[in-house]
């Protein structure tokens, strides 16, 4: 009787079987770089799924080529290429569309690359390294045009100014936050912090540097007055990632207390600047610097996590929209595409994934 019922099944309206999400993701690994549609049989499962919403060759693309943990990844502002770097000291440049070819490798650092950033027009790429330097690269030619030396220990973070003269701020294990003008050899300003600095960013107008580190506090330094303006407290463990929203009003922070927070960094904001707390992602004993990022329109945020999942939250409701599997190691950075609904993740499993999100 049961067998007969089973045979009748197909006459019912066809409802897609809910497959475990990890099967979907890992199935698509076959549809990664170099796999044409005819080879990617597991990927066909995804093709038959939800309608496509980006120009990626497949809904999920795997980028493999690094020889060590991948710590950072960023899309070029024009959205057609991306950069990744990590423990192997190399910066790899990739095409976003087509087969996602690794079309260039930038060599020059003698230590792990901890963070990468393009400047606003994408003409320059900045990289912070454990070799105590920050390198400035011409993103067209791949040539290193400048090396910023002055830190006495690992440089954990760098961030280029969004507008005005090309300034860059850096944070290091030597406990300092430095401001550089790339036309000059030495740092223009140095702010002394008691403990290691793990993450830095500018405010929107680039007259303040915001830093986070192992003292759990987020500090805002005024470049005109050359002093600490205010401190934002709330995290109960080291702050590992900072990201400013695209319109510059809000700051996102990721910390080892397993929370991601949003802070109001507008001038004259109320004294209690923490406006939202997000939970779900985790940090662990590996103590990797897990970063965080905003979607271009500010409606979503994403953060690295040590549990091998990519977390994406809705900014308004604070709900986890996506918990994406597929990686086999800590996810150290997640980046949103500037124009399309694509998310990029860099992991300790030496791989990067690009995937569509609705």
Swiss-Prot record:
Spans through the membrane: none
Listed PROSITE patterns: WD_REPEATS_1, WD_REPEATS_2, WD_REPEATS_REGION
Subunit structure, interactors included: Component of the pre-catalytic and catalytic spliceosome complexes. Component of the postcatalytic spliceosome P complex. Part of the U5 snRNP complex. Interacts with PRPF8. Component of the U4/U6-U5 tri-snRNP complex composed of the U4, U6 and U5 snRNAs and at least PRPF3, PRPF4, PRPF6, PRPF8, PRPF31, SNRNP200, TXNL4A, WDR57, SNRNP40, DDX23, CD2BP2, PPIH, SNU13, EFTUD2, SART1 and USP39. Component of the minor spliceosome, which splices U12-type introns.
Primary residence: nucleus
SMART domains for this protein: WD40 (SM00320)
Entry's localization field: Nucleus
GO aspect biological process, one term: RNA splicing
Position of the Glycyl lysine isopeptide (Lys-Gly) (interchain with G-Cter in SUMO2) cross-link: 18, 271
GO CC annotation: cytosol; nuclear speck; U2-type catalytic step 2 spliceosome; U4/U6 x U5 tri-snRNP complex
The keyword Ribosomal protein is assigned to this record: no
Swiss-Prot/TrEMBL keywords: Isopeptide bond, Methylation, mRNA processing, mRNA splicing, Nucleus, Repeat, Spliceosome, Ubl conjugation, WD repeat
Source domain of life: Eukaryota
Placement of WD repeats on the sequence: 65-104, 108-147, 150-190, 192-231, 234-273, 284-323, 326-358
Source lineage: Eukaryota, Metazoa, Chordata, Craniata, Vertebrata
Asymmetric dimethylarginine PTM positions: 21
Species this chain originates from: Mus musculus
This protein's name: U5 small nuclear ribonucleoprotein 40 kDa protein
Function: Required for pre-mRNA splicing as component of the activated spliceosome. Component of the U5 small nuclear ribonucleoprotein (snRNP) complex and the U4/U6-U5 tri-snRNP complex, building blocks of the spliceosome. As a component of the minor spliceosome, involved in the splicing of U12-type introns in pre-mRNAs.
Recorded name of the encoding gene: Snrnp40
CDD domains hit by this protein: WD40
């Amino acid at each position: 009787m049961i067998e007969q019922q089973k045979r009748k099944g197909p006459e019912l309206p066809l409802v897609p079987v809910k497959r475990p999400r990890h099967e979907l993701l890992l199935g698509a690994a076959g549809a990664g770089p170099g796999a044409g549609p005819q080879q990617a049989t597991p990927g066909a499962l995804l093709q038959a799924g939800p309608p496509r919403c980006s120009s990626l060759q497949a809904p999920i693309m795997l980028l493999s080529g690094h020889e060590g943990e991948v710590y950072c990844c960023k899309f070029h502002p024009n959205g057609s290429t991306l950069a990744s770097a990590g423990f192997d000291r190399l910066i790899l440049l990739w095409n976003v569309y087509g087969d996602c070819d690794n079309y260039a490798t930038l060599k020059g650092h003698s230590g792990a690359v901890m963070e990468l950033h393009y400047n606003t027009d994408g003409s320059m790429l900045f990289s912070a390294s454990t070799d105590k330097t920050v390198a400035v690269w011409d993103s067209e030619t791949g040539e290193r045009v400048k090396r910023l030396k002055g830190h006495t220990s690992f440089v954990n973070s760098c961030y280029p100014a969004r507008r005005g003269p090309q300034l860059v701020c850096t944070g290091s294990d030597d406990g300092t936050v430095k401001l550089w003008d790339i036309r000059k050899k030495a740092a223009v300003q140095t702010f002394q912090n008691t403990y290691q600095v793990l993450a830095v960013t500018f405010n929107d107008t680039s007259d303040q540097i915001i830093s986070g580190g192992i003292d759990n506090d987020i500090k805002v330094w005024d470049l005109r007055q050359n002093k600490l303006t205010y401190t934002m407290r709330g995290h109960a463990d080291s702050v590992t990632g900072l990201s400013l929203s695209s319109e510059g009003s809000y700051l996102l922070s990721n910390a080892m207390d397993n929370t991601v927070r949003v802070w109001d960094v507008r001038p004259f904001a109320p004294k209690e600047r923490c406006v939202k707390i997000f939970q779900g992602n985790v940090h662990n004993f590996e103590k990797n610097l897990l970063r965080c990022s905003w979607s271009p329109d500010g409606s979503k945020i994403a953060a690295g996590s040590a549990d091998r999942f990519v977390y994406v939250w809705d900014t308004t409701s604070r709900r986890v929209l996506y918990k994406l599997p597929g990686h086999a190691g800590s996810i150290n950075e997640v980046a949103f595409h500037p124009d399309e609904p694509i998310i990029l993740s860099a992991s300790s499993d030496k791989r990067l994934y690009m995937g569509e999100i609705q």
